[in-house]
């Protein structure tokens, strides 16, 4: 008969296996991620996609996501509750160096201190991940990305910091270019061509009744963002003290 330790180890292995299949980054309150987009922003770029996604409670607890078919404008899952509205999102591949957390939720995260003395916890990623964000009120966040494309000429020419503040109805995001070195290692540049197109990834994850189950795990796996989150009143370059912290 398995003891507590064996059961705990088994559950962790199962959770890590599920996490390895997922490639999205979902930020929690206070998290910030540093990344270099792999997407270029050019027409027909498979590494950047527009999505409509339902998020709703599943039977028996937990959450589910269901992708909207762009041809029929209907969810690809038949159990979406009546009266639900999908969230308008965009997703892109990026090379992520690290995620900075304001709370330590894992022992292997490194404690770091900013010049002002603020503590945070660094999660090393150094891998390709998908970052998904809402378009925002009046396409606010999307327009931030477009502005950066106009400045750089291509999205993959620089490094972005994406930060989430708040939760639920009080959730806001900020996106800003930063002078930080985040480069795809020369030995991994060939992997970019092999990345699964964003749309295909989302269809495989959230395109049917059996593929859309969600559980709340660590930031590089999944956390549900409410469909009615607050997305207004955040400028391109924020002046919040937390945004200015250099870790």
Residue ranges and their predicted role:
Residues 1-151, 207-215, 221, 241-247:
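OB-fold ssDNA-binding interfaces and closely related basic DNA-contact patches used
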Residues 232-241:
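Short linear regulatory motifs embedded in intrinsically disordered, acidic Ser/Thr-rich regions
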